[in-house]
Amino acid sequence: MKVYLHSPVYSLGDTAYGVEESALASRTLSSADKLREAGFETHHVCSPDTGVQDLAARTATQLGECLDTVSTVVFSTCLPMNGSVGSFADFQESRDVKHLMDFPASRLQAACGLQDTQIIGLNQQACTGMLGGIRLAKALLQAETDVDDILCITADRFPPNAIYEQSYNLISDGAAAVVVSRIERGFRVVGCHQITNGALVQASDDEAVGTYFNYTHRLVQESLAKIHGTISDIDWIIAQNMNVKAWQILARLLAFDSERVYFDSLPEVGHVISGDNVINLKKLDDSDAIRPGEKLLMLMAGYGMNWQSVILEKV
């Protein structure tokens, strides 16, 4: 059974800051010059009263009538704290753990009028959670005939006073979503793959960077092997937003044209936790640069350590 993905949408934190402003405010570890050299210009930070449920609702409502056919929501969060919007202070006062189970997916269901939907929460996959959600949605549609369209959504915000830099990448709060369906529209989901190395769960920034190239190269080769393909079958790589030099190196390792590695949203939005692939997919698709039949490889690395991929084909 073929499964498709369509309607990528996203939203960002309330306030945009330039790298100079955030460096001066100690929101970053690297200097503004270093961040600019890596390709970053601005990032987006939520106001204190904006929660992940707000980011998710802002994103999902952009889908309009597409929500009418959604039967299941797969809601992924990178930070475990974003898996509940309840008050820890209320728990401490009452000692009642219900305050720790105020799930943003349930809030989203109510806010968007998705009364008859099933809810699945996905975490412990860090920045790869969105691609993991797409993989799960594909498997559900192929395994359960009574499941209709699936909303895959991710939303995360850093806590107040957090450092908005990880592994030398400038972070933005934000959310992103796609609809996964049996209806032929947008892109066919050709294949999905995941690698996890739990021994690296507490990897430092330098260790994360050091393992990135080896594991991402392995991820690409194993992903292509699963669909009996080679790198020459891929027309575009839809990348995560990270240091531009890293992608130049990786493209050479993969023997892939670096001009076909797309992460043009990087200067404007930074690294939007689990949302980069969706944001870049939307921007590239909106440009009409993708031709029917072309294959796209979406890649993401995340703490845990996790690496995930999704291969798409434009319909």
Question: Where are the predicted features?
Answer:
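Catalytic phosphate/nucleotide-handling subdomain of diverse soluble enzymes
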Residues: L284-P292, I311-V315
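Acidic, glycine-rich active-site loops and adjacent beta-strand->loop/helix elements
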Residues: S76-M81, Q124-T128, T154-P159, M300-M305
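Conserved beta-strand elements of the Class I
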Residues: Y4, S71-V74, D149-L151, D235, ...
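Condensing-enzyme catalytic core mediating Claisen C-C bond formation in acyl metabolism
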Residues: M1-D49, A162-E222, K226, A301, ...
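Glycine-rich phosphate-binding loops at beta-strand->alpha-helix junctions
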Residues: I237-A246, V269-V272
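Phosphate/pyrophosphate-binding loops at sites that engage ATP/ADP/AMP, CoA/4′-phosphopantetheine
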Residues: A56-S71, R218-D235, L254, L284-A289
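Conserved catalytic cysteine-centered active-site region
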Residues: T28, A32-Q53, P80-L136, L140-D148, ...
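Flexible, glycine-rich active-site loops centered on histidine and acidic residues
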Residues: Q142, V147, I153-G174
